[in-house]
Amino acid sequence: NSSCLSDVFCSYLQKKHCYLSTWEPLSNFEQALRLVVKSGLEEIYGPQWVTDAPKRKPYYEKIFPQLNALLVKEQATFKRGGDVDLLEFSYPGTLKDIIITEWDFFCDIFKGNKTLFKQSMDAICLVRNPLAHARRAELIPASNLWAAKKAIDDLNVFLDKPHD
């Protein structure tokens, strides 16, 4: 090896680059997906979707109180009040479950490809928490990071288009 860097160090740098280059697109994707989900829930259940959705679908009876508990905890911790969106406390897995629960509505956005949507979200969920909590790059397989990045790109195609 004529390089002054060891193979191990080069491998580390490659993983670190992949790790860092995945975080920003993931963060942007997650925020965009939250907006799509919120807009969808408002369209399905109206402006009072936080109270009306649980009356119509049992899934929300379980998940909304959990999200609300996180919201209350953050408001108490950071002394912030005001109008905070409940979905700000959702993870991509929760957003995936909401979209699948409301697939009849969201299928148009994702062009009816539920399998691609689910597989892509599963790939994203696999790396999201380690990335969000700044785990060491070498603990996340590079193949998982690349798969998540591809999944984000695949789903962004749907999110970037105007919807009727």
Features from the language model and the residues they span:
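Amphipathic alpha-helical interface elements
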Residues: 1-164
